[in-house]
Amino acid sequence: MRRLSSWRKMATAEKQKHDGRVKIGHYILGDTLGVGTFGKVKVGKHELTGHKVAVKILNRQKIRSLDVVGKIRREIQNLKLFRHPHIIKLYQVISTPSDIFMVMEYVSGGELFDYICKNGRLDEKESRRLFQQILSGVDYCHRHMVVHRDLKPENVLLDAHMNAKIADFGLSNMMSDGEFLRTSCGSPNYAAPEVISGRLYAGPEVDIWSSGVILYALLCGTLPFDDDHVPTLFKKICDGIFYTPQYLNPSVISLLKHMLQVDPMKRATIKDIREHEWFKQDLPKYLFPEDPSYSSTMIDDEALKEVCEKFECSEEEVLSCLYNRNHQDPLAVAYHLIIDNRRIMNEAKDFYLATSPPDSFLDDHHLTRPHPERVPFLVAETPRARHTLDELNPQKSKHQGVRKAKWHLGIRSQSRPNDIMAEVCRAIKQLDYEWKVVNPYYLRVRRKNPVTSTYSKMSLQLYQVDSRTYLLDFRSIDDEITEAKSGTATPQRSGSVSNYRSCQRSDSDAEAQGKSSEVSLTSSVTSLDSSPVDLTPRPGSHTIEFFEMCANLIKILAQ
């Protein structure tokens, strides 16, 4: 597999120390803003222009383990070309032997998810304004053949003027379909019926469904589909029946029903939404311009002069980089940073709120609260058991007595890794599941359906979260070919737990792996008996069966 360093210059990429702080390229890294699928996101400051950026750090080892090297290269190349006022911009990519640094636009307002948690539902006018911005960004990327597939309030950021910015657009497209639930923090509430049922889908229609769920959350402060019991939640989503509060405008209800149409062929398109009477009210012209060009080809003399002063270079050098479209050159990056920051300020004055956002929106608590790892289940507020997004705030839940989740796609434990796997093996044996051992901390499990005689399959992988905590991750398996090609272990039925104990490692070995925030625990392969691998193709969706397997296993482990 070709190394990513082969497509990025290394000369300016080496990490340096700047007054005791880490410096990468021209950026001085600061505090951690959050932790994503591939690594951390830190705030950065351009050492010459002084502008803030968000630096997403992609760990090469994790990229290789997820087998997304080629996809990351293609997606980054595309995202670098995107320029839209409501999509987080990618300014530059810097590569080192250990990490890839994506220098992106910085916004200070936090997540839409957190804002709704703190303030509750928005009024209709404000909900429409934000939804118009979100849909404009979705439309822009769809026209460039990029689909998000994981739209949710956590992926919509807010700037200081309460404008929406879609994050991770295109990065989630690198994930395989089978990994959707695992990469969505165990919450399928925003997923379209065709996604959770395992049917094929083109892509844009799933973003429409998720956008409809976001619109509902903006207007109601709740989720249209929610339930403590996963199979029941899936049934609600597949039925497409949701509660509409009386305070909702009949016009927006018709739009929601069109967007949350179960049949993707009958679901609203972006064209349908744009032509809807509710959506067209107070629609700024810049969101859907006749000429879809969002960037000017004219050279900004003031920005050009500022770059020359900061870098002590000639105008010819800067112009050469711009005309040659050398987007990786520091001069070009600095120029576009200056242009974009000025444009953002002007757009805020021209199109958005003239007053400052409320203090409650920009307080320190809101900006620094860590990203929620999973969505907790909430106390029902009416006989309809509506779950408010406001109650999703873990800080509030401490005071409101909100009960913890009954399910998620993983189990956390502070027991020793070998003890965890021993208990897992006992539970699998008690349930009479079949399994094979890939390594002492990675199992592939299957259960035979007594009615259809087909198999439901899942994998169990133990991860180290920190020096004391481990996560047992559940994942559905639909690819028998990959499973057969692994060849590292053979299936076993009701095997002995002693096989795991023979793979024990010392506590010092376990502590040595605590250096990474989340590393897979690996060891030598354990070979059991040689039962044949079943390669019989399985029909359709096994999502429900997968969650039933998870529920049964969790029930036994909880005893």
Curated annotation (Swiss-Prot):
A Pfam family reported for this protein in Swiss-Prot or TrEMBL: Pkinase
Enzyme Commission code(s) on record: 2.7.11.1, 2.7.11.31, 2.7.11.26
Source organism, top-level taxon: Eukaryota
Disordered: annotated span: 485-536
Post-translational modification: Ubiquitinated. Phosphorylated at Thr-183 by STK11/LKB1 in complex with STE20-related adapter-alpha (STRADA) pseudo kinase and CAB39. Also phosphorylated at Thr-183 by CAMKK2; triggered by a rise in intracellular calcium ions, without detectable changes in the AMP/ATP ratio. CAMKK1 can also phosphorylate Thr-183, but at a much lower level. Dephosphorylated by protein phosphatase 2A and 2C (PP2A and PP2C). Phosphorylated by ULK1 and ULK2; leading to negatively regulate AMPK activity and suggesting the existence of a regulatory feedback loop between ULK1, ULK2 and AMPK. Dephosphorylated by PPM1A and PPM1B.
Biological process according to GO: autophagy; CAMKK-AMPK signaling cascade; cellular response to calcium ion; cellular response to ethanol; cellular response to glucose starvation; cellular response to glucose stimulus; cellular response to hydrogen peroxide; cellular response to hypoxia
Transmembrane region(s): none
Biased composition (Low complexity): 516-535
Phosphoserine found at: S356, S360, S397, S467, S486, S496, S508, S524, S527
PROSITE patterns (UniProt xref): PROTEIN_KINASE_ATP, PROTEIN_KINASE_DOM, PROTEIN_KINASE_ST
UniProt: ATP binding residues: L33, G34, V35, G36, T37, F38, G39, K40, V41, K56
UniProt domain Protein kinase: residue ranges: 27-279
Residues at the catalytic site: D150 (proton acceptor)
Stated consequence of mutating Q16R: In a breast cancer sample; somatic mutation
Catalytic activity field: L-seryl-[protein] + ATP = O-phospho-L-seryl-[protein] + ADP + H(+); L-threonyl-[protein] + ATP = O-phospho-L-threonyl-[protein] + ADP + H(+); L-seryl-[acetyl-CoA carboxylase] + ATP = O-phospho-L-seryl-[acetyl-CoA carboxylase] + ADP + H(+); L-seryl-[3-hydroxy-3-methylglutaryl-coenzyme A reductase] + ATP = O-phospho-L-seryl-[3-hydroxy-3-methylglutaryl-coenzyme A reductase] + ADP + H(+)
UniProt note on regulation of activity: Activated by phosphorylation on Thr-183. Binding of AMP to non-catalytic gamma subunit (PRKAG1, PRKAG2 or PRKAG3) results in allosteric activation, inducing phosphorylation on Thr-183. AMP-binding to gamma subunit also sustains activity by preventing dephosphorylation of Thr-183. ADP also stimulates Thr-183 phosphorylation, without stimulating already phosphorylated AMPK. ATP promotes dephosphorylation of Thr-183, rendering the enzyme inactive. Under physiological conditions AMPK mainly exists in its inactive form in complex with ATP, which is much more abundant than AMP.
Domain comment in the entry: The AIS (autoinhibitory sequence) region shows some sequence similarity with the ubiquitin-associated domains and represses kinase activity.
Family: Belongs to the protein kinase superfamily. CAMK Ser/Thr protein kinase family. SNF1 subfamily.
Protein name per its UniProtKB record: 5'-AMP-activated protein kinase catalytic subunit alpha-1
Organism: Homo sapiens
